[in-house]
Amino acid sequence: PFQVSKAVETDDEVMVECRYYSNAGCDVIFRDFPHEFKCKIIFHLSARGLEQEVVFTNRSRERMPLGVGFHTPLRIPFAGGENGDYVMRVAVGEQAELDARNLPTGRKLPLNAQFARLREGGLRVTGCEPIEAGFKLREIEVDGKPYRGALVENLRTGVRVFYEVDDRTTYWTIWNNGGQVPYCCPEPQSWTTNAPNAADPEAEGFCAVAPGESWSAKYRLYVRQAGE
């Protein structure tokens, strides 16, 4: 359903812009979500990495609830070696207790010994047991600087893949599809899963966009050597 609306290539970068419109006349989503809106995603690929901006504009006459998340798989291994050479770190805070349907109950739990390694030291997330967990976002330190995002590091070579998010992201779902596949998904979300039905939706990141207004968020994927 997305259409490429702009594409520019220079010596330094490639930019692609895609747009998607939802309204009563052309989109089945409108039947279940009766708000007319425009979604625009802009990609910039350069020496800085892959930068992504998503923009939603409310074209309806009522406030539009909006929660944005990405199901982002990071391949592991990605630079040679074995699963055991790689660890993931993520800017996580408290863990969200999940019910039998994997929906947050509203209770926040301190990180256990396993998930505390996401903040410091790193956690092996492939070739291991299944992981399906949700967390509030809290910045970590990487090389002495505050960092808001996830990263995967090859401990043998020092090569790192960073997945950086802005302050629109408030929650992570981390999922490794059983643990025996060559990827793990640190999934950034603007609100806690099922936030509209929470006891305190705003505390879980719930937001609504006013008519004619826009909401945007930015993300960046890039590769660095440890210490750079």
Regions found by a protein language model. Name each.
Residues R156-G227:
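Active-site pocket scaffolds in enzymes
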Residues P1, H35-F37, E82, G144-P146, ...:
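Residues that act as N-cap/strand-start positions at coil-to-secondary-structure junctions
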Residues S5-V16, H44-G49, F78, E82, ...:
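A short, structured loop/turn motif at beta-sheet edges
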Residues P1-A47:
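Extended, loop-rich substrate-binding clefts of extracytoplasmic carbohydrate-active enzymes
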Residues R59-R61, Q225:
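Short, acidic/polar linear motifs in exposed loop/turn regions
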Residues I41-F43, L50-N58:
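Short, well-ordered beta-strand segments enriched in hydrophobic/aromatic residues
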Residues R63, P73-D166:
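Active-site/ligand-binding surface loops and adjacent short beta/alpha elements
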